[in-house]
Amino acid sequence: MSLEYLPPVRRRIGQYNHLRIYKKILLLKSNFEKLNFFLGNLFPEELHDSKIHVYFEVRLGCRIPDCIIVFRHFGEKLLKTFHCYFFEFKTTFAKSNLFSIQKNRTQKIQYLQGLRQLRQATDYLQQFVIKNESLCKVNPVICFFRQHGLKLDFVKTFIAKELQLSSTFLCNLFTKYQNDTVKSILSISNPTNFRRACQKYSNLYRGRYATTPKLGNSKTSKRKRRNSKKQDFKKLVKN
């Protein structure tokens, strides 16, 4: 099942809104309550004091999850459990819910594609399992946001996988393979410049600030037209 039937501009708008979601997550990263609320209150309270690492569009084999959030526990000693959330974000023009996802063709395809992306991305981590390492709880999550106002309409969390993984290795892996262009865009602090960069990256940039090339000197064009009329008149007189 594919969304190829959608006009290209619809897909570009979706990409643009993904960048807006990423930026919002970064802005809320330091506030556990607000970040948790924005993403549907899916983080347990026990993660409140954990160190948060956020990565966007990390290439894991043939899959690129939209966002990965890692919670690492630090205290007098490193606890033997850490949490890793894999997110797939879907944006819609209309409101989405469980019923609309079942009945609406586009939303249903978005949901199924998200499931496949999450399953294959989390399966990719299996190759890095190390015996007697920390226990990593890998939580796949799919979120449907409304494009207007980035309102979260629907969120679904799936059964977590428990894998023995090195948190340090995993964070280094995600850092290495995340999208550097997206990371650069998200580092822009000025709202206007950030919006323009998002539009340009998504091919929605209208070139509002670009200079329009001149077609030619208007005086020269007028002179050519006058000379042409004179030549036509002379031909008529001769005939």
Curated annotation (Swiss-Prot):
Q: What induces it?
A: Expressed late in the infection cycle.
Basic and acidic residues composition bias: which ranges? Answer: 229-239
Q: Which UniProt keywords apply?
A: Host cytoplasm, Host Golgi apparatus, Host nucleus, Late protein, Virion
Compartment(s): Virion; Host cytoplasm; Host nucleus, Host nucleolus; Host Golgi apparatus
The answer on whether this UniProt entry bears the keyword Kinase reads no
Report residue spans for region: Disordered: 212-239
Recorded superkingdom:
Viruses
Identify one Pfam family in the record: Herpes_UL24
Extract one GO cellular component term from the record. Answer: host cell nucleolus
Task: Give the InterPro entries listed for this entry.
Answer: Herpes_UL24 (IPR002580)
What this protein is reported to do is described as: May participate in nuclear egress of viral particles. Plays a role in the dispersal of several host nucleolar proteins including NCL/nucleolin and NPM1. Since deletion of host NCL/nucleolin negatively impact on nuclear egress, UL24 supposedly acts on this process through its effect on host nucleoli.
Q: Which family does it belong to?
A: Belongs to the herpesviridae UL24 family.
Please report the name of this protein according to its UniProt entry: Protein UL24 homolog
Q: Where does this protein come from, organism-wise?
A: Human herpesvirus 7 (strain JI) (HHV-7)
Per the record, the gene is U49
